[in-house]
């Protein structure tokens, strides 16, 4: 048996080149899907993408890690849908400008999964506290525990 507890939720944002002409808030209608780097495989983001761009619209690139976004985001029109923590890390490194969406995909929820009836180890407690400390300072993240 497991206990599944929501840990946090994260807004989903657009990461684009620092030289991008996009403003602080962008409509999905203003995004060119041919310039998109798809890095999220969450069904809710895929459904959002299908809604705005159609089922047959191909992105520029499918990526399996944020490192790919970091590498390819140099062109002013390239963009990617990323969760808040990744967005802020890219922004802090000067690698991306972050834009909010007028109609974003659903927020990403992360969970703490533990064995029912077992207390967290001291190491796990420390890790959880470190996560809380780091995440409470990131705009776009809501902590639940």
What positions do the PLM features span?
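C-terminal regulatory
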Residues: 2-77, 86-107, 125, 129, ...
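A short beta-strand structural signal in non-transmembrane regions
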Residues: 110-113
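Catalytic strand-loop-helix junctions within cyclic-nucleotide turnover domains
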Residues: 118
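Short, conserved charged micro-motifs
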Residues: 122
């Amino acid at each position: 048996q497991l206990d599944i507890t929501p840990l946090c939720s994260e807004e989903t944002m657009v990461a684009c080149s620092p030289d991008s002409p996009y403003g602080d808030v962008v409509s999905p209608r203003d995004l060119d899907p041919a310039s998109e780097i798809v890095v999220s495989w969450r069904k809710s983001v895929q459904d959002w993408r299908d809604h705005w761009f159609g089922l047959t619209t191909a992105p520029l690139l499918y990526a399996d890690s944020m490192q790919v976004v970091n590498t390819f985001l140099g062109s002013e029109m390239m963009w990617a849908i990323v969760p808040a923590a990744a967005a802020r890390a890219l922004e802090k490194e000067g690698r991306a400008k972050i834009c909010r969406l007028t109609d974003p995909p659903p927020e990403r929820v992360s969970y703490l999964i533990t064995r029912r009836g077992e207390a967290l180890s001291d190491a796990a407690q420390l890790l959880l506290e470190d996560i809380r400390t780091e995440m409470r300072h990131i705009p776009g993240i809501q902590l639940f525990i």
